[in-house]
Amino acid sequence: MKNLKINFISLGCPKNLVDTEVLIGKLNQENISFTANPEEADVILINTCGFIEPAKEESIETILEAVKLKQNSNKKIIVTGCLVERYKQELEKEIPEVDYFIDLKNQSQIPVLFDIKPKENTKRIISTPKHTAYLKISEGCDHTCSFCAIPNIRGKHRSKPIEALVEEAKYLANLGVKELNIVSQDTSYYGYDLYGKPMLFELLQHLEKIDGIKWIRLYYLYPSTVDEDFFKFIKGSEKILHYIEMPIQHSEDKILKDMMRGYRKKKLYQILEWKEKYTPDMTIRSSVIVGYPTETEEDFENMKNFIQEAQFDWLGVFVYSHEEGTPAYQKHKDKIPKKEKIRRLNEISALQENITEQKNKSLIGKELDIIIDGFSEEWETLPIGRSYRSAFEIDGAVYVETTEPVNVGDIIKVRIKDTIDKYDVVGEAE
């Protein structure tokens, strides 16, 4: 086979990025090289997202852009991921210019298209800066949230064995990874299927022992499986950051019940109490959905009040997406007008911006450990990094004033001087 240049495009969440990195590893052969420029590629491989409308639109737009590049050339286009899992037949009919649509169960066979025999033990190639990487600990989800298409796409919850995850984490540490980002569809449910009981703590204890790993960050915790012992465990750890991502989706019992979330507002208050008791410096990133079909103006106002009370450090706000195949799609009409949904989104976004800004102002004068991610595009010598309070490429940044040279991946002491905007701050290296 002739030498080939492949351009990978990974859309959607970090879990999808891990899948892409695994594919890159499987295709990492002598006669194959990778390029960030789709125009110079022989093959464009797109790993799509497809669980809500904006994600589907982005995936379709990306595919169509690739189709334009294919015109008058011999390029091949391969499309895989969640969008293909949901709509393979429709995509094959509507976009025949794509050479291969590969669903999730056949993703591991993509190397065969390049005359490469699939291997089980191929190491993934990380695409993030070498000091930070994701560790996907499970696949699929056992929850049946009424609005969510993920169980239909990704299937039931399937935990990876602790031994395999420790081996993968050691491999990442040997590459230079210092920050290990734990991702899955439901991180706090880890282990139930394999071991018959929750095993997240046991997994984390193994990961903490790995030389080179300095920070462990937890994403995608589900409120119903977060308990008091969780916060006690975090308090006693030296490597697990006081940062959690825990989507609540709504605060009101009526909506939570209809969403089939498995908890009520009382549990959210409990979680906030445990956080204050054991880890008062804990940063919480959450997310909410506005415009759910049964959400009244009163429900919306109550959720605003709860958000003001909860004082989340970071909050993603999403408009309800009416997804076919979900319980909410079967049960309800998408009756709240788009204009009204946008109004609600904007109101909560503005509320959260003020909360985040005040949180950042409270950091002024404090000394924090900062991991350096890179350098400013405007001022090339100005390092940019994050404290424990910010996830990579998601939350706000820390601009670091320093007279000493620093490298990407360094963890240095920085005293926060001021806020730059609602999300970012500036500090001085100690």
UniProtKB/Swiss-Prot annotation:
Q: Where does [4Fe-4S] cluster 2 bind?
A: 141, 145, 148
The UniProt entry lists the main location of this chain as: cytoplasm
Q: Which family does it belong to?
A: Belongs to the methylthiotransferase family. RimO subfamily.
What UniProt keywords apply to this chain's record, in alphabetical order? 4Fe-4S, Cytoplasm, Iron, Iron-sulfur, Metal-binding, S-adenosyl-L-methionine, Transferase
Q: Does the keyword S-adenosyl-L-methionine apply?
A: yes
Which protein is depicted? Ribosomal protein uS12 methylthiotransferase RimO
- Outline what the protein does: Catalyzes the methylthiolation of an aspartic acid residue of ribosomal protein uS12.
- Enumerate the residues binding [4Fe-4S] cluster 1: 13, 49, 82
Domain of life of the native organism? Bacteria
Query: Which Gene Ontology terms cover its molecular function?
Result: 4 iron, 4 sulfur cluster binding; aspartic acid methylthiotransferase activity; metal ion binding; protein methylthiotransferase activity
